[in-house]
Amino acid sequence: MDINMQKRNEVLAQNVIKGLESRNMSGYYAADKEAAVKQALELIPEGSSIAMGGCTSAHEIGLIKALEDGNYNYINRAKMSPRESLMAAYDADVFLSSANAITSDGVMVNIDGNSNRVSCIAQGPKKVVFIVGMNKVCSDLDAAMKRARNVAAPANAQRFEVKTPCKTAGKCFDCKSPDTICCQFLITRYSRHKDRIHVILVNDILGL
C-alpha cells in the first residue's frame, strides 16, 4: 500500500476509534492482517465458543484458520441446521462479524437477509468482534447507507442463488423480491453494555 494512503488510513482510524469510544464501544487499529489477527486473539480468551455471521473479512486476514488451529470452540454453522446454528450463535461467548459500512464517527451499518447476523450483533453473544477494512469507512451515515446498499449488498448477492435486480445490475433498486437479501437494516450507534462491542480497523481492503 502507498505510504501516503497508509498514513491517511492511520489518521482516519484514530478518528473512528474516538467516535466508537464515545459510543461505549472499543476500537483498535491494525497496520496489517497479521496485526489484526493478533489483536483479535487478544480479545478472545482460549476455550471461548465462537460463532460467525458470514464474515469474509475474518477469513481474509487468516483469523478463522487461527481459531480452528487453536484452543477454541469454533462453531461451524455448515455442520448445523439453520436453527441450530442460530441458537448456538446467540449463546456464544464471541460473535465475529464485519460491517457493511462504518462512519468516520463510529456508527456501523449492516444489512441482512436471514437476519441472523444483525440479530447477534444487537443482542445475544457476550462479546462481538468486528473485523473492518479501512475501505468501508464513510464520511457520514448517508454515505454509509449508500455503500451498504449499492456496494456491499449487490456484491454479496453474487454469493447466493438469488434473483434480485442488484445481482444483475450492480446497484440497489430498493426491491421487494422474495429473494431480497436486504430484509433488515441495523444501525449500531451505541452499545448498551460496555466492553461488548470491539471494532478492529484493518489497514487493508477487506470484505465486500
Where are these regions (language model features)?
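Glycine- and acidic-residue-enriched helix-capping/strand-helix junction motifs
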Residues: 1-9
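Short, flexible active-site loop motifs that bind/organize anionic cofactors or intermediates
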Residues: 3, 25-27, 134
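N-terminal active-site beta-alpha-beta segment that forms phosphate/nucleotide-binding
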Residues: 9-96
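Conserved phosphate- and dinucleotide-binding cores of soluble alpha/beta proteins
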Residues: 90-208
